[in-house]
Regions:
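Metal-dependent phosphohydrolase cores
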Residues: 1-147
């Protein structure tokens, strides 16, 4: 699957509402949609200029809706053409603790992800992120045209 537009990505993110993680240890947050919104909101507060980092926190639950395998790798593969290599790298490597030890971006993403599991605050709604997704996709599109 390849996302061709922010609208398609928004549809996938909306489909994550009400989705439940697999049972068992490390199954993930109880509400992946809300968790992703909280993660992105925490990153927005801490790193307001880093839209790609915020978006990486937002799109993480998408992989659970796609074919079997590693959800982080699926998400990275699906968002890369639309959102760029950096977002895909952050999403893919976030699931591997050894990868984020020496990477400040991954450490920030992981910290926000962990905090969002227990944080209880109004993180807004998904529609609040449409403009950030569009800006990130447009920036990636321009960069891709230059390559």
């Amino acid at each position: 699957m390849e996302l061709r537009s922010v609208e398609e990505l928004m549809d996938l993110l909306y489909a994550c509402r009400g989705e439940r993680p697999p049972a068992g240890p490390g199954g993930g947050p109880g509400d992946p949609h809300g968790h992703a919104l909280r993660t992105a909101a925490l990153l927005r507060r801490r790193r307001p200029a880093d839209k790609e980092l915020q978006v990486a926190g937002l799109v993480s639950p998408v992989g659970r809706l796609l074919w079997p395998g590693d959800p982080a790798a699926r998400t990275a593969d699906v968002v890369r053409p639309l959102l760029g290599a950096r977002v895909a790298r952050l999403v893919r490597r976030q699931a591997h603790p050894g990868a984020w030890v020496h990477d400040d971006d991954l450490a920030s993403l992981r910290q926000a992800d962990d905090e969002a599991r227990t944080a209880d605050f109004d993180a807004g709604v998904l529609e609040d992120w449409r403009t950030v997704l569009e800006l990130t996709a447009a920036r990636n599109s321009r960069l891709g045209a230059v390559d």
